[in-house]
Amino acid sequence: MAESRTERKVTVILATDVVGYSVMMEENEEQTLKNLKVCRAIVEGLIKDHHGRIFNTAGDSVLAEFQSAVEAVICATEFQNTIKERNNSVGEEEQMEFRVGVNMGDAVSYTHLTLPTIYSV
């Protein structure tokens, strides 16, 4: 039988997603993907700078894990401020608005053979 392991730990999760992403993709897929690539680079850099680790992405969303709630909140605030500055310096077609949430709590991680660790908060 396949071996699996379950662990619990307190962790901090930062989640981001683009407001109106589906509509933006419908209206101008090429421009939306270009804008997302720029914004994704911003959030990835900030997550790294604040000692976080991206553990999942899907479309317009990013999930990152932090050991420190303070670092996660600072990262989220800097990301929102950087996106606001970017939006003020580009045309309307290049602007993106993000929702950002931070959650701290007991997480369950599952490891099954060679499959990646899956967190459930």
Name what the model sees in each region.
Residues 84-92:
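Active-site phosphate-binding and catalytic loops of NTP-dependent enzymes
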Residues 80, 92-95, 113:
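Cross-kingdom TIR/SEFIR domain
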Residues 22-25, 87, 108:
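Short amphipathic alpha-helical interaction patches enriched in hydrophobic/aromatic residues
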Residues 18, 107, 115:
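Hydrophobic pocket-lining residues within nucleotide cofactor-binding pockets
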